[in-house]
């Protein structure tokens, strides 16, 4: 696991964050690049926010967002 790698978590604020043991959660905001685990590998994607009709955060590549997925902050993960 790299120093930027952790697990994806939905925060009380409604934003997704990469959480690492002993570290403050790193919230992922609209426009941020991050890596998410898909089929056992980390893939680079970008977070966006949809205002309607289904309000919420999503990845531009359509990757599912779920608690406890392996994820990494930044472009280089």
Regions found by a protein language model. Give the residues of each.
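Short coil-to-beta-strand transition motifs
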Residues: 1-3, 37-46
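Mixed-charge, Lys/Arg-rich low-complexity intrinsically disordered regions
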Residues: 1-26
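Assembly/interface hotspot detector across virion components, adhesins/toxins, and nucleic-acid enzymes
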Residues: 6-8, 35, 47-49
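A short, compositionally biased
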Residues: 11-13, 28-32, 52-54
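A sequence-composition feature that detects small, non-aromatic residues
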Residues: 12, 17, 39, 71-72
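Short polybasic amphipathic segments
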Residues: 15-20, 34, 55-59
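Short coil-to-beta transition motif at edge beta-strands of beta-rich domains
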Residues: 24-38
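Short, compact, well-ordered microdomains
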Residues: 41-77
């Amino acid at each position: 696991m790299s120093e930027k790698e952790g697990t994806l978590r939905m925060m009380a604020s409604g934003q997704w964050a990469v959480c690492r043991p002993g570290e403050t959660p790193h919230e992922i905001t609209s426009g941020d690049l991050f890596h998410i685990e898909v089929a056992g590998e980390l893939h680079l994607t970008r977070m966006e926010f949809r205002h309607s009709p289904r309000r919420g955060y999503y990845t531009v590549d359509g990757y599912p967002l779920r608690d406890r997925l392996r994820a990494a902050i930044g472009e280089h993960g």
